Every structure is written in structure tokens, then in C-alpha cells.
UniProtKB/Swiss-Prot annotation:
It is a multi-pass membrane protein. This is Ammonia monooxygenase alpha subunit. Its cofactor is Cu(+). Disruption phenotype: Cells lacking amoA1 grow more slowly than wild-type cells, while cells lacking amoA2 grow at rates similar to wild-type. Cu(+) binds at residues 187, 191, 204. GO terms for cellular component: cytoplasm; plasma membrane. It comes from Nitrosomonas europaea (strain ATCC 19718 / CIP 103999 / KCTC 2705 / NBRC 14298).
Length: 276
């Protein structure tokens, strides 16, 4: 027996072979288009809101980068999770979104920043959100509750972002002395590769106001990001509900137009045995 129980589902739906074949053709066209749209729109959304912090290595600091990136990244994850869970009961919406985002980012980094603009690829490496996305999907799969997913999965999405990226970006925070000035590796790379807007956009990754809390800047930033990610998950879950729910306006026998959200809105005549 197949893990997806395809034969049982088709038998219960009482679909003729022609309808099954047509459904498969529609899926073969629909889902690749959906993936391409998800890669393009999520990448554009992410670059507009968190682009500067995720573009450059010298902007990946311990304060704003762990705050901004998860808050922006959880938005699409939440909406697509609603769509896949409610319509297909598939708990991999967040992982799918993050993988699509990484595909779009790496295409941009290689062809736009490395091949076209000649920046070194390790200076424009994108951050990863896969650990938090996996926690979102696992929480939804195990609890089957969107509110618990928002509180637990959304919190872990913000908390796991910085430690999940630390093996990749940690070495760029090592100190070096350049002509008598103490810099980090990321700051030094930023001074070597001048970008449009410099010096307006030059910033050192070890400067900021969160140090007034005793120096634990990353911990404070991670917990704040986790809290806001919970709220963002809730908001975008309902946005997914608004934009991913089919509805019908049906005119009744007395001429009254009513709003329906189910496929039986136009009656049960098309079903062989009716709806029980």
C-alpha cells in the first residue's frame, strides 16, 4: 500500500479514469508554476525588507541581522504552511519556502554579485533559515495546531537563526589588526570591496546600542526576534487563510445571494450518492 494512499483516495472520490488523468496533467503544470512564483516573489519580498543585512558579510552583525532576518523570513512560511496544511495536509510549507528562497538567493549571488559585479562569493553568502523552518514544520506536524506552532515553532524560528548560521559566519567575526586598527574580518572585507553609497552605508559589526544591556547582545536580539516571529506567524497565517480559501457566491431559490466556502455550494446533484 502506498504511503500516500492514492488508490483509496481515488476510489472514495469516484473519479473516472479520464478525470484522474486530467487531474494529473493539471498538477504537472500547476505545481512547477507555483514553485517558480514562490522562488521569485519570496526572494523579492525578502530582498526588499532584509536585503542589506543578508547581502553583505560586514552587515551580518550580532544585533540587527538576527532580529530583522527571521521576522521577515517567517512571513511567507506561515502563509504557505496554511495553504499546504489546510488543503493538502502536508506539513512542509516552511521548509519548502526556505529552500525556494535559498535557490533564488544563490542564483542572484552567483550571477549578479559574483559573475556580474565580481564580489567574492564568501562576501555575499546568504544566511540559512532551515533549522527554524524544520522546527515550524515539525511542530505543526506533531501538534496539528496552528497556535502551538506559532508559539513554539515561531519562537524556535527566531532563536535558532543565529546559532544555525554561526558555523558559516563565525570566522568572519575574528579580530585582525590592519595598519594599527582593530577590525573584524567582515569589516576589513567591507573596506576592501567598496559598494555604491559608501561611506554612507559603511558600518562596523561590533558597534550598536544593545551593549547597554551588559554585552549579551545576541541573546537579547534572538529572544526579541523569537517574540516578534510568533506575532508575524499569526498575522501571516490569517493572511494565508484570506488569500488561499476558495469561496462561492450562490443565488438561492428566493433570489438571495449567500457566501459559501465549500464545494457543495451549488448543490449535490453532481455527486453520485449525495453528500452525507
Amino acid at each position: 500500500m502506498s504511503i500516500f494512499r492514492t488508490e483509496e483516495i481515488l476510489k472514495a472520490a469516484k473519479m473516472p479514469p479520464e478525470a484522474v488523468h486530467m487531474s494529473r496533467l493539471i498538477d504537472a503544470v500547476y505545481f512547477p508554476i507555483l514553485i517558480i512564483l514562490l522562488v521569485g516573489t519570496y526572494h523579492m519580498h525578502f530582498m526588499l525588507l532584509a536585503g542589506d543585512w543578508d547581502f553583505w558579510m560586514d552587515w551580518k552583525d550580532r544585533q540587527w541581522w538576527p532580529v530583522v532576518t527571521p521576522i521577515v523570513g517567517i512571513t511567507y512560511c506561515s502563509a504557505i504552511m496554511y495553504y499546504l496544511w489546510v488543503n493538502y495536509r502536508q506539513p512542509f510549507g516552511a521548509t519548502l519556502c526556505v529552500v525556494c528562497l535559498l535557490i533564488g538567493e544563490w542564483l542572484t549571488r552567483y550571477w549578479g554579485f559574483y559573475w556580474w559585479s565580481h564580489y567574492p562569493i564568501n562576501f555575499v553568502t546568504p544566511g540559512i533559515m532551515l533549522p527554524g523552518a524544520l522546527m515550524l514544520d515539525f511542530t505543526l506536524y506533531l501538534t496539528r495546531n496552528w497556535l502551538v506552532t506559532a508559539l513554539v515553532g515561531g519562537g524556535f524560528f527566531g532563536l535558532l537563526f543565529y546559532p544555525g548560521n554561526w558555523p558559516i559566519f563565525g570566522p568572519t567575526h575574528l579580530p585582525i589588526v590592519v595598519e594599527g586598527t582593530l577590525l573584524s574580518m567582515a569589516d576589513y572585507m567591507g573596506h576592501l570591496y567598496v559598494r555604491t553609497g559608501t561611506p554612507e552605508y559603511v558600518r562596523h559589526i561590533e558597534q550598536g546600542s544593545l551593549r547597554t544591556f551588559g554585552g549579551h547582545t545576541t541573546v537579547i536580539a534572538a529572544f526579541f526576534s523569537a517574540f516578534v516571529s510568533m506575532l508575524m506567524f499569526t498575522v501571516w497565517w490569517y493572511l494565508g487563510k484570506v488569500y488561499c480559501t476558495a469561496f462561492f457566491y450562490v443565488k438561492g431559490k428566493r433570489g438571495r445571494i449567500v457566501h459559501r466556502n465549500d464545494v457543495t455550494a451549488f448543490g449535490e446533484e453532481g455527486f453520485p450518492e449525495g453528500i452525507k
